[in-house]
């Protein structure tokens, strides 16, 4: 099998994941690495339909935590088999905006579903496809809330169900991420996401650079 690298980005809403993925992808491509960027839920035609249902559909108001868990992992199962595994098989660097740690944090800690049940569903969806490195962009709740308000003021007509939780919900999600990072320190690296874009980018590079030798360049 070709050398490859699977990096996931995690964090609460407004932590800056999408911006940092774009910057890292650009840097890696300039250096000659084959890069594939993805997002969850989504990344495939099936996954994008699920994403719309989970986040923006008018019909999701009464969605239960159990349904949310299954839909997220249906999208993930498709993404793993249709995109992630093939990309890794040919030696690409895969950068994914969220992966299964989001499910543990949001549906497990946030929604209060049994963590053992959540893990079993995740395991079924991803099999042995696991990230080599996870970057958890940690921001204080007040920073996250401020960034969300700013984003919503720019896009006021786009409803996102996953941004509608109260502060207690997002506090539980943050606690979930902290627990994950504490349990797997070799895989999960905590990055202070409250700094400037440039400072956060530099810190991410400190964690990414040591794992790059395992990947071939073009």
Show the residue positions of the predicted features.
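Conserved phosphate-donor/acceptor-positioning beta-strand/loop module used by diverse small-molecule
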Residues: 96-98, 127-148
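NTP-dependent small-molecule kinase module
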Residues: 25, 142-218
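Walker A (P-loop) phosphate-binding loop of P-loop NTPases
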Residues: 14
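Hydrophobic anchor at the beta1->P-loop junction of P-loop NTPases
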Residues: 9
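Pre-Walker A (Motif I) flank of P-loop NTPase domains
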Residues: 2-6
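ATP-dependent small-molecule kinase phosphotransfer cores
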Residues: 31-126, 203
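Hydrophobic positions on the alpha1 helix immediately C-terminal to the Walker A/P-loop
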Residues: 20
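Conserved lysine of the Walker
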Residues: 17
